[in-house]
């Protein structure tokens, strides 16, 4: 189950910046190249384990894009990308977001009141970005059907669940000076 994803994480290099360990992986960073087999494995797994009874798949640039695109192609569900750039379009929603390591603005376009949404993201650590996005989408009248994160690290998923939103993670990891260790794969302990 998710063997390609597991292997890619297990060999991920880890760097330390400001007392925080970052893992470098194709799914979360695009380094090294994102192999088609990895995207196919993830998209297949999500389609097989998620209702997919939604109007739109929503993801956040940058690394949510390849995952969400693969999922859109596999499922036939339209895709909307939350951007880091302001376009100034009618109905554009600005979202202030902060994570454990950055702050900034995101911009939502192409979402309508009543849209049933599946949010897909590459990784969640603190949950700060997704909390802000979920709140903005709900305030805009969207219905968040489910959130799927590929890699769960830290306590961010717990914070999202406190918002009474169904959240799934495909794989849970720990990261330290020794590297990436897998804690759980889609509900099964390692």
From Swiss-Prot:
Keywords: Cytoplasm, Glycosyltransferase, Purine salvage, Transferase
The keyword Cell cycle belongs to this UniProt entry's keyword annotation: no
E.C. no: 2.4.2.8
Assembly notes: Homodimer.
Pfam families: Pribosyltran
InterPro entries per record: HGPRTase-like (IPR026597), PRibTrfase_dom (IPR000836), PRTase-like (IPR029057), Pur/Pyrimidine_PRTase (IPR050118)
GO cellular component, one term: cytoplasm
Reaction catalyzed: IMP + diphosphate = hypoxanthine + 5-phospho-alpha-D-ribose 1-diphosphate; GMP + diphosphate = guanine + 5-phospho-alpha-D-ribose 1-diphosphate
Record flagged with keyword Ligase: no
Protein name: Hypoxanthine/guanine phosphoribosyltransferase
Organism: Methanohalobium evestigatum (strain ATCC BAA-1072 / DSM 3721 / NBRC 107634 / OCM 161 / Z-7303)
Superkingdom of this protein's organism: Archaea
Signal sequence interval, chain numbering: none
NCBIfam families, sorted: HPT_Archaea, PRK02304.1-4
